[in-house]
Amino acid sequence: MGASEQPPQRLARPADAPAISALMRASILALFPAFYDARYVESAARFIGELDMALIDDGTYYVHEAGGDIVACGGWSRRNRLYTGSGSSEDDGRLLDPATEPARVRAMFVRGDWTRRGLGRAILERCERDAAAEGFTTLALMATLPGEQLYRAYGFGELERTMVRLPDGVELEGVAMERPCAPS
């Protein structure tokens, strides 16, 4: 595959879960150290690198596969949960109202040796298109620092910088962001 070619994108399947989980952890361990110290990286790998199977079950999670390996993953949700890693709440599974609430961009990860090749952007484009087709007019996400540049380049605006408390008490700096969906 040439440097400018993207590996194909497809919907994630339940059988992909082990490979996706491994990619999430590997991506965190490779990319987070440039932004966070070791304690934060290990906590993020443990709690943020946890796959929410509802994304796959809902048909809103995508992967790019190259040579039989999943090299990028990400998706969106019509459910209330904004990110994995904060523990769960009763309201996480609530379906969002597309007329008044933003769809959630979730669990975006790219393998370290596949960054800067347009895979994250391709997943965001798919998320936006599919969410807009279901009536959503806005996308929201909680960015970790390694992903902030991608989201800004895609047109997400910062709502606020915040500290995300993980279940072990570690507080990880994040950025709440939103952008309008292009009309479908």
Predicted regions and their residues:
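A short beta-loop-alpha structural element at the N-terminal edge
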Residues: P8-A22
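C-terminal "cap" of GNAT-fold acetyltransferases
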Residues: T137, M142-E148, Y154, E160-S184
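Conserved acyl-donor/pantetheine-binding loop and adjacent beta-alpha core of acyl/acetyltransferases
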Residues: D58, E65, V71-T115, D130, ...
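Short loop/turn motifs at secondary-structure junctions and domain boundaries
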Residues: D52-D58
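Conserved acetyl-CoA pyrophosphate-binding loop and the N-cap/start of the following alpha-helix
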Residues: W114, G118-R126
